[in-house]
């Protein structure tokens, strides 16, 4: 097993699975156990930075809230700015909004209007890719501000839920550290 393969297995093993949360039939992938393990958290950040080093990224965008936990340290290590995308009403300056569909209803994300320019090459970071709706809305915000979406990075992917294909249809390539079956 290579060093990277060992690190990826270590990261995967540090993520606890909680059955029937938040509702029956769901296998919840809990990253708080990864965050509580400094070696696993460090390995996660190291692998993301290693993958994106030298790609000309000028901004890292993290989607509320767990995207902040991984996006901010990656931005810091890459030496670029970090931009939070938040739920509606949480940002203090003038914002741009994007509404997207949830399983039952809709939600709205916002970004500061002055946070991305047409010169920016943007990496999006979130903890988990399921259906892809949240990160797709994040990409629309970035593109509406003129930024170029380079890729979306995730710690966890649930491939059975179709998020990778949804993002590919929108021209968004993704990079994931670990996959889990099911939902």
Curated annotation (Swiss-Prot):
This protein's record includes keyword Lipoprotein: no
Record-linked InterPro entries: Ade_phspho_trans, PRibTrfase_dom, PRTase-like, UPRTase/APRTase
GO biological-process terms attached to the record: adenine salvage; AMP salvage; purine ribonucleoside salvage
Catalytic activity line of the entry: AMP + diphosphate = 5-phospho-alpha-D-ribose 1-diphosphate + adenine
Subcellular location: Cytoplasm
Pathway: Purine metabolism; AMP biosynthesis via salvage pathway; AMP from adenine: step 1/1
PROSITE patterns reported for this sequence: PUR_PYR_PR_TRANSFER
Any Pfam family the entry gives: Pribosyltran
EC number assigned by the record: 2.4.2.7
Keywords carried by this UniProt record: Cytoplasm, Glycosyltransferase, Purine salvage, Transferase
GO terms for cellular component: cytoplasm
Molecular function per GO: adenine binding; adenine phosphoribosyltransferase activity; AMP binding
Its biological purpose: Catalyzes a salvage reaction resulting in the formation of AMP, that is energically less costly than de novo synthesis.
Protein family per UniProt: Belongs to the purine/pyrimidine phosphoribosyltransferase family.
Quaternary structure note: Homodimer.
Protein name, as recorded: Adenine phosphoribosyltransferase
Organism: Proteus mirabilis (strain HI4320)
């Amino acid at each position: 097993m290579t060093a990277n393969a060992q690190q990826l297995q270590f990261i995967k093993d540090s993520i606890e699975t909680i059955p029937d949360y938040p509702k029956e039939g769901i296998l919840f992938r809990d990253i708080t156990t990864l965050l509580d393990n400094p070696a696993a958290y460090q390995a996660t950040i190291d692998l993301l930075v290693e993958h994106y080093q030298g790609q000309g990224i000028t901004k890292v965008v993290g989607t509320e809230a767990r995207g902040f936990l991984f996006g901010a340290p990656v931005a810091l290590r890459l030496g670029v700015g970090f931009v939070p995308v938040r739920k509606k009403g949480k940002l203090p300056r003038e914002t741009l909004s994007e509404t997207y569909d949830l399983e039952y209803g809709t939600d709205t994300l916002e970004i500061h209007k002055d946070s991305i320019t047409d010169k920016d090459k943007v990496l999006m970071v979130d903890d988990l890719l399921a259906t892809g709706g949240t990160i797709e809305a994040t990409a629309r915000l970035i593109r509406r501000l003129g930024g170029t979406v380079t890729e979306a990075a995730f710690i966890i992917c649930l491939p059975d839920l179709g998020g990778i294909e949804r993002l590919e249809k929108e021209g968004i390539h993704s990079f994931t550290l670990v996959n889990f079956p099911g939902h």
